[in-house]
Amino acid sequence: GCSHRIGTPSTRLALPEITIGLFPDAGATWFLSQMPRHWAYFMAWTGCQLNAQDGLVVGLIDHLLDYTEQAAILECLTNEVWSADGEANKLRLSQILQNAASDAKDFPPSQLIAHEARIMAVMDQVLASEKPVSAFFTAVDDFADDKFLARAANGIKRGSPTTAHIIHE
């Protein structure tokens, strides 16, 4: 990982392993293990694309920065007197990014938050079942009425069953 994870209005995040038949690598596995369980399984089983606001929700992004702040941030970073103390530099960088943080009004809204109740209900039911992968495969049939959820459902429907089972293990 990195020390300061930044999202912009055009940020796109995904875990496409399900769609290409691979298993999540050590980095993805670590990040998934740090997330709330329902988000981790939903993301890994669907390969859904997330935006910066979603990244904040699942803990993959720390700061939202608008493009309009880029020049000012670069100037601030260039003019900063950095020390030999790595921890002090991290703290100072955090302060700079926090000061420049966007109020996110120009960012696309979180799709995860918009669909949280529905995703949580499905994931709670699926993860409590004896065969979670099969249960999720069936449960996503109910996602057809929503563009974001239908696209997410296609991830597992068209993805690798082997990868889905590896993700569950």
Predicted features by range, described:
Residues 66-159:
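Amphipathic alpha-helical blocks and their helix-capping loop/short-beta junctions
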